[in-house]
């Protein structure tokens, strides 16, 4: 029986994970559940899974969580330090589904605690943690198994032991793939939150619409799998059936295909290195009839071009951190109706040109550049308003 903790249990990935764990109680013992502010759902999940500990990151929710779990025997804690305390608990697998760079400190604490496997759904922590995170995981023996569909597919393809010369990850193209530039000028928040294939949270839905999500995934793949600029490619694949492809020197290639269902990579990461047999729908190629692949237009998706530019830059580490930080601020501003949809990526690119670059050698350096990127992004937004 594996000991498991889930960070970000009340988000979409977290809720899907909890559903899998609740249906396989004979295989998992839940040690800790960590959520941001949804205290009622966290309490329900903790009771359902009989977790040993429930942590709410929002200090103000502590008393409510304590009342909700009174008499359950479940330990309760709140605040940022409590999140790190949960990350230090001894588990076999930790699911990291917290969005944004705030996940990075917890990921590093998990690695320091010697966790066997991190099922990682926080691409931002890899983009910002970069080589520092990868080297720490290698030193401690922690295996990072990515949970997002494309990187989980790459992980599986590379696990076959072959040495591909190139990896291609796919992108759905988002909700505005065929919209004109004039139409994009009038995109509403509601428009951006409706994804044609995947069911996701607000931030990642907006990132998918701007193609920033795929841009971050390009950087994530570079760090996770040590892939250089020429070894990563992206194609738009609206059906989201093929998640990644590996190309070999003998002229052959291998693709990993599945229905667009996040429970598949989550299940794989939870049971890794074993494969869990479950009743799932297989891909019916006859029903689909055809699969579509489109080369992305860098003029239409400047965020994606920026990611490949970063891969070629000698300032990759700092640039990745600032790229993510500025985007988090810009997306938040868009969701607060402070900027337009088209301004999101423009602001990010503007911030990239204003940051003084240097070296990253510690977690403190990462947080410093993250803060700098956020401050400049807020200044740019303020000056434009």
Curated annotation (Swiss-Prot):
Catalysed transformations (reactions): 2-C-methyl-D-erythritol 4-phosphate + NADP(+) = 1-deoxy-D-xylulose 5-phosphate + NADPH + H(+)
Keyword entries, A-Z: Isoprene biosynthesis, Manganese, Metal-binding, NADP, Oxidoreductase
Pathway this chain belongs to: Isoprenoid biosynthesis; isopentenyl diphosphate biosynthesis via DXP pathway; isopentenyl diphosphate from 1-deoxy-D-xylulose 5-phosphate: step 1/6
Cofactor(s) annotated in UniProt: Mg(2+); Mn(2+)
UniProt-listed HAMAP family: DXP_reductoisom
Biological function: Catalyzes the NADPH-dependent rearrangement and reduction of 1-deoxy-D-xylulose-5-phosphate (DXP) to 2-C-methyl-D-erythritol 4-phosphate (MEP).
NCBIfam families (UniProt xref): Dxr
Family to which this protein belongs: Belongs to the DXR family.
Name of the protein in its database record: 1-deoxy-D-xylulose 5-phosphate reductoisomerase
Species this protein is from: Anaplasma phagocytophilum (strain HZ)
């Amino acid at each position: 029986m594996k000991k498991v903790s889930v960070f970000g249990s009340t988000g979409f990935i977290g809720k899907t994970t909890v559903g899998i764990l609740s249906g396989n109680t004979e295989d998992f013992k839940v040690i800790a559940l960590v959520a941001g502010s949804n205290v009622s759902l966290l309490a329900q999940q903790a009771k359902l899974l009989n977790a040993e500990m429930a942590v709410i990151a929002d200090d103000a929710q502590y008393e409510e969580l304590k009342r909700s779990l009174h008499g359950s025997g479940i330990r309760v804690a709140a605040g940022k330090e409590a999140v790190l305390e949960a990350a230090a608990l001894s588990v076999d697998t930790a699911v990291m589904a917290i969005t944004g760079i705030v996940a990075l400190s917890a990921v590093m604490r998990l690695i320091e605690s010697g966790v066997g496997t991190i099922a990682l759904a926080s691409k931002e922590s890899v983009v910002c943690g970069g080589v520092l995170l990868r080297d720490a995981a290698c030193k401690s023996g922690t295996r990072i198994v990515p949970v997002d569909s494309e990187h989980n597919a790459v992980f599986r393809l590379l696990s076959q032991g072959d040495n591909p010369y190139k990896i291609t990850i796919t992108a759905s193209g988002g909700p505005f793939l065929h919209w004109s530039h004039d139409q994009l000028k009038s995109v509403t928040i509601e428009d951006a939150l409706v994804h044609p294939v995947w069911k996701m949270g607000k931030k990642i839905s907006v990132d998918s619409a701007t193609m920033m999500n795929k841009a971050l995934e390009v950087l994530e793949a570079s760090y996770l799998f040590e892939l250089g600029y020429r070894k990563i490619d992206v194609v738009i694949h609206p059906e989201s059936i093929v998640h990644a492809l590996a190309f070999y020197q003998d002229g052959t290639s291998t693709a990993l295909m599945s229905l667009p269902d996040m429970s598949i990579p989550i299940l794989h990461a939870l049971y890794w290195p074993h494969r869990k047999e479950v009743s799932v729908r297989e891909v019916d190629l006859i029903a689909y009839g055809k699969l579509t692949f489109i080369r992305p237009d860098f003029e239409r998706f400047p965020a994606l071009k920026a990611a490949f530019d970063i891969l070629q830059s000698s300032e990759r580490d700092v640039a990745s951190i600032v790229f993510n930080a500025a985007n988090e601020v810009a997306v938040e501003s868009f969701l607060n109706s402070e900027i337009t949809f088209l301004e999101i990526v423009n602001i990010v690119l503007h911030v990239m040109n204003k940051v003084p670059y240097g070296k990253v050698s510690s977690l403190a350096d990462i947080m410093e550049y993250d803060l700098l990127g956020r401050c400049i992004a807020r200044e740019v937004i303020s000056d434009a308003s």
